[in-house]
Curated annotation (Swiss-Prot):
SUPFAM superfamilies: PapD-like
Recorded name of the encoding gene: Mospd1
Topological relation to the membrane, as annotated: Multi-pass membrane protein
Transmembrane segment boundaries: 159-179, 191-211
A GO cellular-component term linked to this record: Golgi membrane
Ranges of residues in domain MSP: 16-143
UniProt protein name: Motile sperm domain-containing protein 1
InterPro entries recorded: Ig-like_fold (IPR013783), MOSPD1/3 (IPR039283), MSP_dom (IPR000535), PapD-like_sf (IPR008962)
Primary role: Plays a role in differentiation and/or proliferation of mesenchymal stem cells. Proposed to be involved in epithelial-to-mesenchymal transition (EMT). However, another study suggests that it is not required for EMT or stem cell self-renewal and acts during later stages of differentiation.
Keywords assigned by UniProt, alphabetized: Differentiation, Endoplasmic reticulum, Golgi apparatus, Membrane, Transmembrane, Transmembrane helix
Induction: May be up-regulated in response to cell-cell contact.
Amino acid sequence: MHQQKRQPELVEGNLPVFVFPTELIFYADDQSTHKQVLTLYNPYEFALKFKVLCTTPNKYVVVDAAGAVKPQCCVDIVIRHRDVRSCHYGVIDKFRLQVSEQSQRKALGRKEVIATLLPSAKEQQKEEEEKRIKEHLTESVFFEQSCQPENRAVSSGPSLLTVFLGVVCIAALMLPTLGDMESLVPLYLHLSVNQKLVAAYILGLITMAILRT
């Protein structure tokens, strides 16, 4: 007797929920960003019901805050910010998407999406750039501090090889260029333009290395 294949029972709250994006940023000076779209994906072989909850529902309008997603399909959820005021700048709100099977009420999974209102996209880019610079400086200071004791133990200044290479590069740049017929320097000491460019590049690297010591 052929038995019907049963779907395994799903544990409440453990089902992964796939939403994109996971962060919404609204800019007060850009009205086109006042409407954002969340995409909910259903990669499973059964249909899902969904519901959108919010920590501050008075600030947002959610189009189709509840509905269903067919198996292996997706649905777009439109979210509009309707209270764009300076007092809300930087405040983090949260949306929660709960999903369940169509035949049941218990939530199988949930996913939180944060939403933030910022005054301007340009200010946001500036803050991110300043943050990157600050992180870079912090990393470089840490690197120098960790290497200073070893550097002091090895030498207190540039090595003799570095100084010698620097002198050679300076001398190479002072030599005449190929084609300079009025020079008193022997022809075999005339350097090409490419050779002088290489010498200048190496001299620049040496100068940077000396300045860091």
